[in-house]
Amino acid sequence: STAEKLSGACVPGMPNLHSHAFQRAMTGLTEIGGGTENNFWSWQKVMYDFLAALGPEDVEAIAAQLYVEMLKGGYTSVGEFHYLHHGPGGKTYSDPNEMSNRIFSAASQTGIALTHLPVLYAQGGFGGQPPLDGQKRFLHDIDSFARLVTELQARCRSLPGTETGMAFHSLRAVSPEMMSEILKFITDGPVHIHIAEQMREVTQCVEWSRQRPVEWLFEKQHIDSRWCLVHATHMTEEETSSLAKSGAVAGLCPSTEA
């Protein structure tokens, strides 16, 4: 009875379930002609260098422009996989929620529906490798991340069209112990994770755990309809079957996986 009635034929708005808004401003910076070998890892290096100069105002402006472009293209909701939390060098802002608040503001200005997904990122690689300098703006420990998510969830209650879930960047960026502790503390809302995106990641995971990424995740955690496995590109038939039976979603990203 409260739904708005529209005249004529209507097409439902599309959801964009996996956005890194700040990366929109990197367009054109990472693919070089002339036989240069480009891959995910060379792209990642450029991304680290690029974000070192971004401040809160930049992130809000970039996100607002991106969300307008999404709306023009028919996307009416977005899942923002947000891991740019801190200032240069990893210095915490006076308001630790500063960067997330900028995403909320961009969504509010443009009118797009937002599922905000603050990302836990705690290490530089499998087995607790130290983070690179370019990763320091992403980092949280268990307590600070749990506090961040709790505060953002509370704020969302007063923001129409907005909710907050959570995300783990990847198996290589979060220890098993941290993942389990956070899941005990945050028991509702969507959970997203990058997984099995690159064969190098799969190989490193096997070297670390003797299991492939999706195989490891399903053995160690209870995967259900809360979960979105982003990319999930390199899976065996057994892993694919486990995902299909779980109720979880495979989050495909056609523009980066083509």
Question: Language model features by range: what are they?
Answer:
Residues 219-258:
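Active-site-adjacent C-terminal substructures of enzyme catalytic domains
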Residues 12-24, 190-199:
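Histidine-centered catalytic micro-motifs
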